[in-house]
Amino acid sequence: MAQSFFELIKRIQALAEIGLHYSTSTYDTERYEEIQEISLKILNQLTDIPVEKIKPVIEENNGYKTPKVDIRAVVFNGEGKILLIQEKVDRCWALPGGWADVGYSPKMVAEKECFEEAGLKVKASHLLAVMDKTAQKMPPQFEYVYKLFIRCEPSGTNISTGSETLDVGWFGENEIPELSLPRNLKSHIHMMFEYDRGERNSVYLD
């Protein structure tokens, strides 16, 4: 129920932002701003995060609200083990990746994140999955997020930590450490192993 309520509030926020973007009436603008302020206060009560911290996130992309894109690199070492990085922020593990960057293609982001987080040069090859974070029942956050999982081929197997990672490693399917759930679920990792074994061929799409 909490996640459902959270998503409804985010939808209200998005509609208010779209209204502000297109409104030509002072009256309508004031009403959309009031709706925005009310939804911020509800988010504050739901999350216990102060309004002054929520507001900059909401206002970051004022205008027609669209989903943010999170890109994850899927790398195997040729021995059936997948590359994971340990995040400094929560000390849990995830596929290398992060937000899509303006000026970078999805392939470029996957390659860049692998090198920055795991010290590994890779060549992005093809898309494996496109997931809707809400549909996947992942922990809620302010942004509405799509996740792209991109298969990458490594130039080697030597890996090293980056500025945002505590550790990096290659893991078998039965060796998966505690995962950073806002970034990936265990079901996502198992799906990537299915692709590696050839048990899945078509792109997964939410």
Language-model region placement:
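Extended, positively charged loop/linker patches that create polyanion-binding surfaces
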Residues: 96-98
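Acidic, metal-coordinating catalytic segment for phosphate/diphosphate chemistry
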Residues: 29, 33-72
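Unchanged
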Residues: 100-124, 132-188, 204-205
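N-terminal strand-loop-strand
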Residues: 55-94, 122, 126
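Nudix hydrolase/Nudix homology domain
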Residues: 1-32, 38, 92, 163-206
